[in-house]
């Protein structure tokens, strides 16, 4: 078997690969990036490119190889990142024409799912977080998130037996693309990691050396990075494990970017007590940012509310949905700003028009700071900054505190705009080594070179005309290529007419190529000027870029202000277009919604077709609403829209209702639907009970609980018993109870309203017409004992004979005949009672005597007094 011959180039490759063992190495060779061995096999499958081999024509062992053109790098990188791979970009760092021996190469960047800066690899409307978790003693955990493209850096500590559950909840909230874990704790975190990778598709797990997870060195690293003597200013000094996680991220970013990360200027503590908390299950049930089925953005609350015009505003909106506020004062400040734009349409339209011309300043800033910004990025920044003075003029007309504060603090960055305007070419290329980066008039030396090059083209034309006249060869031409430089070309037929001082350089099939001393002298002057121009333009561009990078904090501050403006103006636009109204924010624990609508469902219906509903909850007589009624009537819609209206109000948003009085809530819980959670290996009933347990253990008197069926995953009697006990617990919790809306098919639960003054019965109005049912979708006071399941089955397309048979059986059951061996529909029925497993009921079955008495009553003829007497008589019969 042939042995592998190691060339100097492959020796260099092996050395670089050894330094970056957990990456796919993109190894630059001329105009291509090449991959070898296992990297080539893996990359060829992901990228869909041909796998070939090196050393085909030698007696050495063949090396698997594939390659991509250098100019197509970003497209192929996107595929690698989407596949969860880490890619090391290895470049030639010296000119091959001047290199002595093998060309020097270095890894200049490592691209991973969580550490990317190119727009082609990013979702403009979402953050791209890389995350680290740390575990200390006594069930203490640290968690940190960093988005290198926006500079956002978040840290948190968790303690207690629920620490890993808290971490998982935050992971599913912020959905990072990469998670860093100590290589020695992968097994300890296995369950959390498995759940995280299941709940967050595409999450990449990256092990890190365990020795880095040290508090002392982590603390020092953070102090050094932020140039402070204490982290108290960030509120993070006491977060031991959180600091470790944060330092792990900084170390990782420095390792992958191979450069300083000066735009990471602030560390923010995740203050869970300051936000309206919504757990992962409730976020999914309410479809805040993506749908349950398919995980699509379209059909979510975010998709309806997003009329933002900038990427910064879109990301801020998403964070506002995921982190609603609890602080009434902050909510009111947001509402006031939205209200200004709601009431001033001209200001709103003007601000939105200006914002629409602003690019992603946050991500442009990160590329500038990291040294990867190109000419088009600089042009985009210049065009964005050009709009700021006009925006400031509009803001000076505002009379709302929140907007006045933005007006007083908005940095229009006019000095940096002037620098960009003077220095950057109005139409620069993407490749910063191609020239045409710098505007004429910015640098005197560059201007001289440009004049020489421009005149040089005229000199070429003059020389060509002169040689044609001298030789009499009409089709003589002066041309250029990279191999021979400048040359004179004549046809073979005319080659005998060339002067003697012409020096033959190349013979072609139909032409001859020559040079002259005059042409060679010109070439030396012009080509040297071209090389000097390219190098000088690159140096000037890098200098301008570095100057902008030194103002990173100013760019980020302005970007944040613009994100706020976009959020406020777009919220007002949504409210105007969709007929939303300002909610009244209170601290009294009450909830009153008049003519409320579901923000997503109403957008899918023709205008005016959605049926609005009123909801009133308090901690006195309307603490728990037990809502009965058939499927398809709209119970679930009313429940979900109530939760969404509360959430929108605490975002600082107007709400889809004619009016709303919202008492600030601390948490929203939902137990909605029933499906097996195969991701967690849990059955329908286990999912229900896990979510219910979370509610019962964590809900407070300031919470809002949404229950859409409990107990459907088990037997009827078990389910009814659990639902009854859960409702009692919620009304009695902490002696105050919890505001709850409970939709159920257990009509027996309506009896709870007689036992507890704070429980009220409601139902969804239905109208019967002949044998069909019409759903009115209106929430009305009072319970119902009808589920209309057979009518719903008919609407769903169940065959008519099955529906008719179901009616017969239902009638027989209600009359007590079905289990007594009587005939139903002419068919003898088997005695079922002796086969039915015994299960105790919460309610004693009525006796035949009571049933007979009720049947004999003519309810239409009874007076109120007679009805009351009859009711007392029936009660006596039960004693």
UniProtKB/Swiss-Prot annotation:
Gene3D superfamilies: 1.10.1420.10, 6.10.140.430, DNA repair protein MutS, domain I (3.40.1170.10), MutS, connector domain (3.30.420.110), P-loop containing nucleotide triphosphate hydrolases (3.40.50.300). InterPro entries: DNA_mismatch_repair_MutS, DNA_mismatch_repair_MutS-lik_N, DNA_mismatch_repair_MutS/MSH, DNA_mismatch_repair_MutS_C, DNA_mismatch_repair_MutS_clamp, DNA_mismatch_repair_MutS_core, DNA_mismatch_repair_MutS_N, DNA_mismatch_repair_MutS_sf. Keywords: ATP-binding, DNA damage, DNA repair, DNA-binding, Nucleotide-binding. GO terms for biological process: mismatch repair. GO terms for cellular component: cytosol. ATP binds at residues 629-636. GO terms for molecular function: ATP binding; ATP-dependent DNA damage sensor activity; damaged DNA binding; mismatched DNA binding. CDD domains: ABC_MutS1 (cd03284). This protein is involved in the repair of mismatches in DNA. It is possible that it carries out the mismatch recognition step. This protein has a weak ATPase activity. This is DNA mismatch repair protein MutS. It comes from Desulfotalea psychrophila (strain LSv54 / DSM 12343). The gene is mutS.
């Amino acid at each position: 078997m042939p042995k592998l011959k190691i060339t100097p180039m492959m020796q260099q490759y092996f050395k670089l690969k050894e330094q970056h063992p957990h990456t796919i190495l993109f190894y630059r060779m001329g105009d291509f990036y090449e991959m070898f061995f296992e990297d080539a096999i893996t990359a060829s499958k992901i990228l869909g490119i041909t796998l070939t081999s090196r050393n085909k024509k030698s007696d050495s062992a063949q090396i698997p190889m594939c390659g991509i053109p250098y100019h197509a790098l970003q497209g192929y990188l996107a595929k690698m990142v989407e596949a969860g791979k880490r890619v090391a970009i290895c470049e030639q760092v010296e000119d091959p024409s001047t290199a002595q021996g093998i060309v020097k190469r270095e890894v200049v960047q490592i691209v991973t799912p969580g550490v990317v800066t190119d727009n082609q690899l990013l979702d403009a409307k979402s953050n791209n977080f890389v995350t680290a978790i740390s575990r200390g003693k006594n069930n203490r955990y640290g968690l940190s998130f960093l988005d290198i493209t926006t500079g956002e850096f978040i840290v948190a500590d968790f303690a207690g037996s629920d620490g890993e559950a808290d971490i998982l909840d935050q992971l599913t909230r912020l959905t990072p693309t990469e998670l860093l874990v100590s290589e020695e704790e992968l097994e300890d975190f296995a369950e959390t990691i498995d759940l995280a990778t299941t709940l967050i598709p595409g999450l990449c797990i990256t092990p890190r050396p365990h020795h880095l997870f040290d508090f002392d060195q982590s603390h020092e690293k953070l102090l050094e990075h932020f140039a402070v003597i204490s982290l108290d200013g960030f509120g993070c000094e006491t977060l031991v494990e959180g600091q470790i996680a944060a330092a792990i991220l900084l170390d990782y970013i420095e390792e992958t970017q191979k450069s300083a990360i000066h735009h990471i200027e602030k560390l923010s503590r995740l203050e869970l007590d300051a936000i309206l908390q919504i757990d992962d299950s409730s976020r999914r049930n309410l479809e805040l940012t993506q749908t349950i089925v398919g995980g699509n953005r379209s059909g979510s609350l975010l998709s309806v509310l997003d009329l933002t015009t900038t990427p910064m505003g879109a990301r801020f909106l998403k964070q506002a949905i995921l982190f609603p506020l609890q602080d009434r004062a902050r909510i009111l400040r947001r509402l006031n700003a939205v209200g200004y734009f709601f009431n001033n349409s001209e200001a709103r339209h003007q601000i939105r028009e200006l914002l629409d011309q602003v690019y992603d300043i946050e991500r442009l800033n990160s590329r500038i700071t990291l040294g990867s910004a190109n000419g088009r990025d600089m042009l985009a920044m210049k065009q964005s900054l050009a709009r700021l003075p006009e925006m400031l003029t509009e803001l000076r007309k505002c009379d709302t505190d929140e907007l006045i504060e933005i007006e007083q603090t908005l940095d229009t960055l006019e000095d940096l705009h002037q620098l960009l305007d003077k220095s950057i070419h109005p139409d620069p290329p993407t490749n910063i080594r191609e020239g045409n980066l710098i505007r004429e008039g910015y640098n005197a030396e560059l201007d001289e070179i440009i004049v020489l090059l421009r005149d040089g083209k005229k000199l070429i034309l003059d020389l060509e005309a002169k040689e044609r006249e001298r030789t009499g060869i009409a089709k003589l031409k002066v041309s250029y290529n990279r191999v021979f430089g400048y040359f004179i070309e004549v046809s073979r037929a005319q080659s005998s007419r060339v002067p003697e001082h012409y020096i033959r350089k190349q013979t072609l099939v139909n032409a001859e190529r020559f040079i002259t001393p005059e042409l060679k002298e010109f070439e030396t002057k012009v080509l040297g000027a071209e090389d000097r121009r390219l190098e000088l333009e690159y140096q000037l561009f890098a200098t301008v870029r570095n100057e902008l990078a030194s103002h990173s904090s100013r760019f980020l501050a302005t970007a944040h202000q613009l994100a706020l403006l976009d959020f406020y103006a777009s919220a007002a636009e949504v409210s105007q277009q969709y007929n939303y109204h300002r909610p009244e924010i209170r601290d009294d624990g009450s909830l009153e919604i008049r003519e409320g609508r579901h923000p997503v469902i109403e957008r899918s219906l023709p205008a005016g077709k959605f049926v609005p509903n009123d909801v009133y909850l308090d901690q006195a007589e309307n603490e728990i609403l037990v809502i009965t009624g058939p499927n398809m009537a709209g119970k679930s819609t009313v429940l979900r829209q109530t939760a969404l209206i509360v959430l929108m109000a605490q975002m600082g948003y107007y709400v889809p209702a004619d009016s709303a009085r919202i008492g600030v809530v601390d948490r929203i819980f939902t137990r909605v639907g029933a499906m097996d959670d195969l991701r967690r290996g849990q059955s329908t009933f286990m999912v229900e009970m896990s979510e219910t347990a979370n509610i019962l253990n964590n809900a407070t008197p300031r919470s809002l609980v949404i229950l859409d069926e409990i107990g459907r995953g088990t037997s009827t009697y078990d389910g009814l018993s659990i639902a009854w006990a859960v409702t009692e617990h919620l009304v009695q919790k902490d002696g105050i109870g919890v505001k709850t809306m409970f939709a159920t098919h257990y009509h027996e639960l309506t009896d709870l309203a007689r036992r507890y003054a704070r429980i009220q019965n409601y139902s969804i109005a239905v109208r019967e017409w002949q044998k069909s049912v019409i759903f009115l979708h209106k929430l009305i006071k009072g319970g119902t004992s009808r589920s209309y399941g057979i009518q719903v089955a008919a609407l769903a397309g169940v065959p008519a004979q099955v529906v008719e048979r179901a009616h017969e059986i239902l009638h027989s059951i209600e009359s007590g005949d079905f289990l007594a061996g009587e005939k139903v529909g002419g068919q003898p029925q088997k005695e079922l009672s002796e086969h039915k497993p015994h299960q105790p009921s919460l309610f004693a079955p009525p006796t035949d005597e009571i049933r007979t008495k009720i049947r004999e009553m003519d309810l239409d003829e009874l007076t109120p007094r007679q009805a009351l007497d009859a009711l007392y008589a029936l009660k006596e019969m039960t004693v």
